[in-house]
């Protein structure tokens, strides 16, 4: 492990066009449940009596707008979550002009909360909401502080600005993410299994010098990586910062 940390530090220190690609493992330490792992959010959602895929779908929003927004308030707001050391480390490297930014599969908004400016949120963010009818925009604070569920303009359901099942990923976001990967000299994957498509398929477009994967479990890209560390992200970053 010590040798891996030394290698990681050397690569990071010698790179000036780092792109980060993050998944659920990065935010677990902030109290955000992993969606798909055992005991994760999907397991919790299943207790509500409907499938997680349906509850997080465009169909459910259209079939039962009231049920959908009640579900969002109960399961998705993550009111007390704060960025952890991994989010802070990524933001610091961007401030130091070593990083092109971060591409994330997460919807928690914690990269932006940590100060990262160049964030491509592939699946949207819970920091923004909008009316499903008239599209008036709301911030997360509006929804939480006022327990706001219906638009004060037209009465429509206020939904989070996330990609639901049955909806397409935002194409401008995909293009920006692809450019970040293609322009990077080092691509650092943190806390992602790299199996959720089409987002994970973006990794195959990396042509730079170093692919680094830090994840508890193996990924389909491990054999292509310069460095693979199967460990907890927080532990790795803490150790890296004391090297």
Swiss-Prot record:
Any one of the GO CC terms: cytoplasm
Binding site for NAD(+): 24, 35-36, 105, 107-108, 123, 192-193, 215, 232
Keywords assigned by UniProt, alphabetized: Cytoplasm, Metal-binding, NAD, Transferase, Zinc
Domain Deacetylase sirtuin-type: 1-243
Names of the cofactor(s): Zn(2+)
SUPFAM superfamilies reported for this sequence: DHS-like NAD/FAD-binding domain (SSF52467)
EC number(s) reported in the record: 2.3.1.286
Single GO molecular function: zinc ion binding
Broad EC category: transferase
Free-text cofactor note: Binds 1 zinc ion per subunit.
Residues noted as binding Zn(2+) in the record, renumbered to the chain: 131, 134, 151, 154
Subcellular location(s) per record: Cytoplasm
Binding sites annotated in the UniProt record for nicotinamide: 35, 107-108
Major localisation: cytoplasm
Catalytic activity: N(6)-acetyl-L-lysyl-[protein] + NAD(+) + H2O = 2''-O-acetyl-ADP-D-ribose + nicotinamide + L-lysyl-[protein]
Active site positions, chain numbering: 123 (proton acceptor)
CDD domains in the record: SIR2H
Family as reported in the entry's similarity comment: Belongs to the sirtuin family. Class U subfamily.
Its job: NAD-dependent protein deacetylase which modulates the activities of several enzymes which are inactive in their acetylated form.
NCBIfam families in alphabetical order: PRK00481.1-1
UniProt name for this protein: NAD-dependent protein deacetylase
Species: Staphylococcus aureus (strain MRSA252)
Lineage: Bacteria, Bacillati, Bacillota, Bacilli, Bacillales
């Amino acid at each position: 492990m010590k040798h891996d940390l030394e290698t990681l530090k050397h690569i990071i220190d010698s790179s000036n066009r780092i792109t980060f690609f993050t998944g659920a493992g990065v935010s677990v330490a902030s109290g955000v449940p992993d969606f798909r792992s055992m005991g994760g959010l999907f397991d919790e959602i299943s207790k509500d009596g409907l499938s997680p895929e349906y509850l997080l779908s465009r169909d459910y929003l259209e079939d039962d707008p009231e049920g959908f927004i009640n579900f969002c308030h109960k399961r998705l707001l993550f009111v007390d979550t704060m960025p952890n050391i991994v989010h802070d480390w990524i933001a610091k490297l961007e401030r130091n002009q070593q990083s092109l930014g971060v591409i994330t599969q997460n919807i928690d908004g914690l990269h932006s909360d940590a100060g990262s400016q160049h964030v491509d949120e592939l699946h949207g963010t819970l920091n923004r909401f909008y009316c499903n009818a008239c599209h008036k925009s709301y911030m997360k604070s509006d929804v939480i502080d006022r327990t706001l569920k219906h638009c004060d303009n037209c009465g429509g359901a206020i939904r989070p600005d996330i990609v639901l099942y049955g909806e397409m990923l935002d194409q401008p976001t995909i293009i920006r993410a692809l450019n970040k990967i293609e322009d990077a000299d080092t691509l650092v994957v943190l806390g992602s299994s790299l199996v959720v498509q089409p987002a994970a398929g973006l990794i195959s477009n990396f042509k730079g010098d170093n692919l680094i994967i830090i994840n508890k479990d193996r990924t389909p890209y491990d054999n292509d990586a310069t460095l693979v560390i199967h460990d907890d992200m927080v532990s790795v970053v803490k150790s890296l910062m004391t090297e």
